[in-house]
């Protein structure tokens, strides 16, 4: 219990430092979600089982960082592409109750876990769907999010048909990204469906846990 309290205090401190406004209720829900994520992870492989840092910080707080580069607006529609255990969709749904989130994953067990956690948290602005992104038809989103390790070129190909005009693809990624960014931009010069610009925001200054981590913002012309 003491460790959980310490992690909760650290979450509050990080949010304050980054200018992320968080209510007591949201804080409690984020802490509860981290607990559920760890519990479900013993049954379904949602996150690494060899964590060297608190799940509440490494995964849950990390999932809030797109708010540093994107203003989530009331009524906005957001797709979480390859959500896994609900990351980043569930933490952001907690923070932005007036934004609608659709979480998709091709692994049924992960979606079962996400749906159960969404229900237990009482989130009415998020739902989880077992499907492949290629099978999403007739839907359009203001913003698409992903924590997947897939190259930006591949994620862009999935995202483009599902983005509304002036939409953004926001990815939480790590490592040396220049090669995959260059590949995506080259495709953008040759054909539609790829971003016209890509911006990077390093987040290592937020915490050493996120050294070599960056937020990738891909925009379509």
Curated annotation (Swiss-Prot):
Q: Which domain of life is it from?
A: Bacteria
- One of its Pfam families is GidB
Q: Where does S-adenosyl-L-methionine bind?
A: 82, 87, 105-107, 133-134, 147
Keywords on this record? Cytoplasm, Methyltransferase, rRNA processing, S-adenosyl-L-methionine, Transferase
Q: Which Gene3D superfamilies does the entry link to?
A: Vaccinia Virus protein VP39 (3.40.50.150)
From the UniProt record, which GO molecular function terms apply? rRNA (guanine-N7-)-methyltransferase activity
Coarse class of the primary localization is cytoplasm
Q: Which InterPro entries match?
A: rRNA_ssu_MeTfrase_G, SAM-dependent_MTases_sf
Question: Which EC number(s) are documented for this chain?
Answer: 2.1.1.-
Is this entry keyworded S-adenosyl-L-methionine? yes
Q: What class of enzyme is it?
A: transferase
Q: Where in the cell is it found?
A: Cytoplasm
Answer yes or no on keyword rRNA-binding. Answer: no
Name the job this protein performs.
Answer: Specifically methylates the N7 position of a guanine in 16S rRNA.
The protein's name: Ribosomal RNA small subunit methyltransferase G
What organism is the protein native to?
Chlorobium phaeovibrioides (strain DSM 265 / 1930)
């Amino acid at each position: 219990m003491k460790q959980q309290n310490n992690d909760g205090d650290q979450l509050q401190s990080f949010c304050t430092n980054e200018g992320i406004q968080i209510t007591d209720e949201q804080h409690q829900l984020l802490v509860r979600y981290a607990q559920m994520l760890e519990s479900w992870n013993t049954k379904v492989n949602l996150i690494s089982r060899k964590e060297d840092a608190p799940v509440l910080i490494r995964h849950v707080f990390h999932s809030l960082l797109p708010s540093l580069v994107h203003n989530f607006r009331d009524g906005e529609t957001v797709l979480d592409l390859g959500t896994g255990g609900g990351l980043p969709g569930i933490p952001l749904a907690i923070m932005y109750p007036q934004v609608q989130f659709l979480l998709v994953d091709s692994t049924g067990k992960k979606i079962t876990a996400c749906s159960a956690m969404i229900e237990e948290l009482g989130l009415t602005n998020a739902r989880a769907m077992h499907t492949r992104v290629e099978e999403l038809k007739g839907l359009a989103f203001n913003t698409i999010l992903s924590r997947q390790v897939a190259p930006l070129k591949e994620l862009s190909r999935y995202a483009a048909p599902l983005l509304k005009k002036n939409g953004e693809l926001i990815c939480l990624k790590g490592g040396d990204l220049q090669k995959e960014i260059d590949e995506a931009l080259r495709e953008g010069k040759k054909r539609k469906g790829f971003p016209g610009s890509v911006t990077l925001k390093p987040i290592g200054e937020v915490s050493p846990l996120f050294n070599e981590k960056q937020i990738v913002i891909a925009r379509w012309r």
